[in-house]
């Protein structure tokens, strides 16, 4: 007997997300996009708290580009097209893990992306992490400063 595996392509709907006291502020803030006062947002919390789900809702609404630890390095291996960066919205998932993976190189890459987007009011960058920016182990003070100056949501 052979077991058949059925692949379903379920589309996530925001009304299926369980909103709690802990995540209601972040959930409501993300839903207000594109009416954000800043282009940089940092969303953090422990694993399984819903930050990936909330950020995926934003990614879909903003038609953004997802940068995970897998495709982050690939994206930066090519020459950066600044116009392309400025004309798209971006989600960097697990910033603290990226920095831990290659502290100096990835810190500089994240800072470059932040600087390009910060100077441009047409693109947004949502970043997620497990830790508050002030607790990220990073030697690049400019990056920590930029993360702390973004809108930080728990």
Where do the PLM segments sit?
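A short, basic N-terminal segment
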Residues: 1-32, 37
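Residue-level preference for the first positions of well-ordered beta-strands
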Residues: 38-42, 63-66, 89-91, 124-126
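Conserved P-loop NTPase "ATPase switch" module shared by AAA+ and STAND
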Residues: 83-109, 113-116, 120-131
């Amino acid at each position: 007997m052979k077991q058949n595996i059925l692949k379903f392509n379920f589309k996530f709907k925001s009304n299926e997300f369980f909103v709690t006291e802990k995540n209601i502020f972040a959930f409501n803030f993300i839903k207000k996009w594109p009416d954000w006062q800043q282009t940089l947002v940092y969303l953090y919390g422990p694993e399984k708290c819903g930050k990936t789900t909330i950020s995926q809702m934003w990614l879909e609404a903003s038609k953004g580009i997802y940068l995970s630890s897998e495709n982050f390095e690939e994206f930066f291996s090519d020459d950066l097209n600044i116009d392309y960066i400025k004309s798209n919205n971006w989600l960097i998932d697990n910033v603290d893990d990226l920095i831990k993976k290659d502290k100096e190189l990835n810190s500089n890459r994240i800072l470059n992306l932040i600087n390009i987007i910060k100077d441009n009011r047409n693109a947004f960058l949502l970043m997620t992490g497990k830790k508050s920016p002030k607790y990220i182990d990073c030697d690049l003070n400019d990056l920590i400063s930029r993360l702390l100056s973004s809108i930080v949501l728990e």
